[in-house]
């Protein structure tokens, strides 16, 4: 027997559907993602903390879920919205159906609504604060009240909420088809020591760095620069993460100290925005952000166009770039800034996700550039 669910947006829009996850309520910023695959990776991406994700592809759940595809040890998305849930999940790697996975993680979700109508609202009006109520006692009035009470992501520091509690070492590499596993690489086979700041890091980022020879020390978001420099790293990586970058004063200050050294710095997503702020630029809140796996981005140096995976609601304001920063990549959807590099230091960053998961690997060579920068410094 199905349970009813209600989705309410702060603008007053109401959608009724079927509860497919945990009972209860959830609030957050409602966004839409256009990826056709990778729903488990999306749900477990810490960058989606405090966001309710609408998946525009109509059939979600076809292949079930498996622990190997998770990007974190839990679901971080505040909720899930889909059009249609298949009756059967079929895949040789599947360990659990999507509804069972959502319930096990306490994730509230709704299916059976018009996601095309919802996406048009979000595209035209911008991301909306929203609420999903799941259960027989759900009312439109209560859902709307909770949606309008959510403060929004502007000014919200979420990196310190999703980061690791303690420092740890990481040696796991990318998935191997023959062994059906993520092999552990001996430390002796990893020539570069990289300290990775966890602002909400995805596991596939760590795996791709290991696959390129990096011995990783992952540190909490609020780790002072002095502690990192004491580890004598070959490079410093600034991870993806959720929320507004501007309140992350602790991260901005640490990055400024790193930029006083000659250690190569590479940032992704939130790390990209933090590098910009540490260099004197400013960031802004986008209308509906970029969330998907089919976003065209142009390399301004070569003219090459790459299809990229994107997940961000904030962006670096190109008009505020100081002389020590130059633009390297731009979105061909809306012209927003996608990449920067310091003109006086070996420090660069990219707004999208070179590691994909889900999505294409067109921008993966940025990892190789980071490796080359460390090799040249030796």
UniProtKB/Swiss-Prot annotation:
It catalyses: hydrogencarbonate + L-glutamine + 2 ATP + H2O = carbamoyl phosphate + L-glutamate + 2 ADP + phosphate + 2 H(+). Small subunit of the glutamine-dependent carbamoyl phosphate synthetase (CPSase). CPSase catalyzes the formation of carbamoyl phosphate from the ammonia moiety of glutamine, carbonate, and phosphate donated by ATP, constituting the first step of 2 biosynthetic pathways, one leading to arginine and/or urea and the other to pyrimidine nucleotides. The small subunit (glutamine amidotransferase) binds and cleaves glutamine to supply the large subunit with the substrate ammonia. L-glutamine binds at residues 47, 241, 243, 270, 273, 311, 313-314. This is Carbamoyl phosphate synthase small chain. Belongs to the CarA family. Residues 193-378 form the Glutamine amidotransferase type-1 domain. GO terms for molecular function: ATP binding; carbamoyl-phosphate synthase (glutamine-hydrolyzing) activity; glutaminase activity. Residues 1-189 are annotated as: CPSase. GO terms for biological process: 'de novo' pyrimidine nucleobase biosynthetic process; 'de novo' UMP biosynthetic process; cellular response to amino acid stimulus; glutamine metabolic process; L-arginine biosynthetic process. One of its GO terms (cellular component) is cytoplasm. Composed of two chains; the small (or glutamine) chain promotes the hydrolysis of glutamine to ammonia, which is used by the large (or ammonia) chain to synthesize carbamoyl phosphate. Tetramer of heterodimers (alpha,beta)4. Pathway: Amino-acid biosynthesis; L-arginine biosynthesis; carbamoyl phosphate from bicarbonate: step 1/1; Pyrimidine metabolism; UMP biosynthesis via de novo pathway; (S)-dihydroorotate from bicarbonate: step 1/3. The active site is at residues 269, 353, 355. Its EC number is 6.3.5.5. HAMAP family: CPSase_S_chain (MF_01209). CDD domains: GATase1_CPSase. It is an enzyme of class 6 (ligase). Keywords: Amino-acid biosynthesis, Arginine biosynthesis, ATP-binding, Glutamine amidotransferase, Ligase, Nucleotide-binding, Pyrimidine biosynthesis. The gene is carA. It comes from Pseudomonas aeruginosa (strain ATCC 15692 / DSM 22644 / CIP 104116 / JCM 14847 / LMG 12228 / 1C / PRS 101 / PAO1). It comes from the Bacteria.
């Amino acid at each position: 027997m199905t349970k009813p669910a209600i989705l309410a947006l702060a603008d007053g829009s109401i959608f009724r559907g079927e509860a497919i996850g945990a009972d209860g309520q959830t609030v957050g910023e409602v966004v839409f993602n256009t990826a056709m695959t990778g729903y488990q990776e999306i749900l477990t991406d810490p960058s989606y903390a405090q966001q309710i994700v609408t998946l525009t592809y109509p059939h979600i759940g076809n292949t079930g879920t498996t622990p190997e595809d998770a990007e974190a040890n839990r679901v971080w998305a505040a909720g899930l919205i889909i059009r249609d849930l298949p009756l059967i999940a079929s895949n040789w790697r599947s360990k659990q159906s999507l509804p069972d996975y959502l319930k096990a993680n306490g994730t509230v979700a709704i299916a059976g609504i018009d996601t095309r109508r919802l996406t048009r609202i979000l595209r035209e009006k911008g991301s909306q604060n929203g609420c999903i109520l799941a259960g027989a006692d759900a009312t439109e009035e209560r859902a709307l009240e909770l949606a309008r009470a959510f403060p929004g992501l502007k000014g919200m520091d979420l990196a310190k909420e999703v980061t690791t509690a303690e420092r740890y070492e990481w040696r796991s590499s990318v998935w191997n088809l023959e062994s059906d596993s993520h092999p552990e690489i001996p430390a002796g086979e990893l020539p570069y020591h990289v300290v990775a700041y966890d602002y909400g890091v995805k596991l596939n980022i760590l795996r791709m760095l290991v696959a390129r020879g990096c011995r990783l020390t992952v540190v909490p978001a609020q780790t002072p620069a002095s502690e990192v420099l004491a580890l004598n790293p070959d490079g410093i990586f600034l991870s993806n993460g959720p929320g507004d970058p501007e309140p992350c004063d602790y991260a901005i200050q640490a990055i400024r100290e790193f930029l006083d050294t000659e250690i190569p710095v590479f940032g992704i997503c939130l790390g990209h925005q933090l590098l910009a702020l540490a260099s004197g630029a400013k960031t802004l809140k986008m209308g509906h952000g970029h969330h998907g796996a089919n976003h065209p981005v142009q390399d301004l140096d070569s003219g090459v166009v790459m299809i990229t995976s994107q997940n961000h609601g904030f962006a670096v304001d190109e008009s505020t770039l100081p002389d020590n920063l130059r633009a390297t990549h731009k979105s061909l959807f809306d012209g927003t800034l996608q990449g920067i590099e310091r003109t006086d230091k070996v420090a660069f960053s990219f707004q999208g996700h070179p590691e994909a998961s889900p999505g294409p690997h067109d921008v993966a060579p940025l990892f190789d550039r980071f490796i080359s920068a460390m090799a040249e410094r030796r």
